[in-house]
Amino acid sequence: MKHTILIVDDSKLARMSAAKALKALYPDWTRVEAATADEAVSMGSSNSFDMALLDFNMPGRDGLQLAAELKAANPSMPIAIVSANHQEEIVARANAIGATFLQKPLTQHALGAFLEAAVAQLQAANK
């Protein structure tokens, strides 16, 4: 089954790296990229995202704020917060809103594990 994944990171290099890893794992999935939370929200009105990879540190709203907004609109959406800033508080806040924390640099293995769990979560929600 094909899915659409939202990748939000203010670093173009980080977005490209995540998109490349995603393409290697699931070449038929659609990847939509945004540089800020505001850009992602504005894209959401014209796109239907199945899951999201969100950078934690971004200008304006951070990834956790965006994740909370996305979860409010779609509670079953699998979301990963991606950051090099591996603090227990950030991990706990991500978990509290139902998001997964992934450490930067994002590896294909870590991304693959998140995506497998995300697909299982989506299938369970659609039953």
Language-model features, listed with the residues they occupy:
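The feature encodes the CheY-like receiver
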Residues: P59
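Active-site residues of response regulator receiver
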Residues: D55
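Alpha4 helix (beta4-alpha4-beta5 surface) of REC/receiver domains from two-component response regulators
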Residues: Q65, H86-L102
